[in-house]
Amino acid sequence: MNEIEIQQQYYERTAAQYDDMHLHRDDEQYFALSYLIGMIEFLQIKSILDVGSGTGRVIRDLKRSHPHLRVLGIEPVKALRDIGYSQGLTSSELVAGDGNSLQYQPGDFDLVCAFGVLHHIRNPELTVAEMLRVAGKAIFISDANNFGQGSRLSRTVKQTINFFRLWPLANLIKTRGKGYAVTEGDGVAYSYSVFMNYSLIRAACKSLHLLNTLDAGANLYRTAPHIALLGIKKRLSNPL
């Protein structure tokens, strides 16, 4: 069984408890979502695509805060989509989809976002590239920074290994060649940092903005365990 099948089975098994396990009003993802909600008017966002919607929390909160916003979520796991439908979302608001191959044209959505998704994907740069392609104005990512997690010693060791570009090899050794870990709380997870895709996003955006969503020091790469990133491709000169 490969990791995609393992993750599929994990979500099917835990779908009924998904919200209780993963959604909390005081967690880092909701902190990031609150920030995004505050940027919608500033950026004059009229449409949003949410990649990896799960049961649709982001869709529901965006609709609640901005009723006239066009919001679409894609989620590959049917069991999670079904939970979303039972909570009031329609099949036109939450649809099947693959973040590595978004079935939309360039610029179809003003903003494309992903909350806690990329650390579940073996090649997250493919999803990020697709997000950048489909986004007309901006992308927003909320996810882990593995290099800012753990004790000071652990962070220093990981950052040193990464400095010499040996992190992929070290991670393979750590995971005994799999490249991922499986936990009851998160299913299949890869060692991921938002900073791994920083250069790709920087090249496609006019401005880039980073926010620590958990307590951290001034150097976010070194100290922040979780990061929100807003990449603005273009913005109106007088958005307000």
Explain the meaning of each model-derived region.
Residues 113:
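A conserved beta-strand element that flanks and buttresses the S-adenosyl-L-methionine
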Residues 1-42, 44-54:
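Conserved class I S-adenosyl-L-methionine
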Residues 125-137:
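A short glycine-rich, Lys/Arg-flanked "PGG" loop and its adjoining helix->strand segment in the class I
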Residues 144-220:
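C-terminal alpha-helical "lid/dimerization" subdomain adjacent to the S-adenosyl-L-methionine
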Residues 116-117:
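Short catalytic micro-motifs in class I SAM-dependent methyltransferases
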Residues 136-144:
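Conserved beta-strand signature within the Rossmann-like core of class I S-adenosyl-L-methionine
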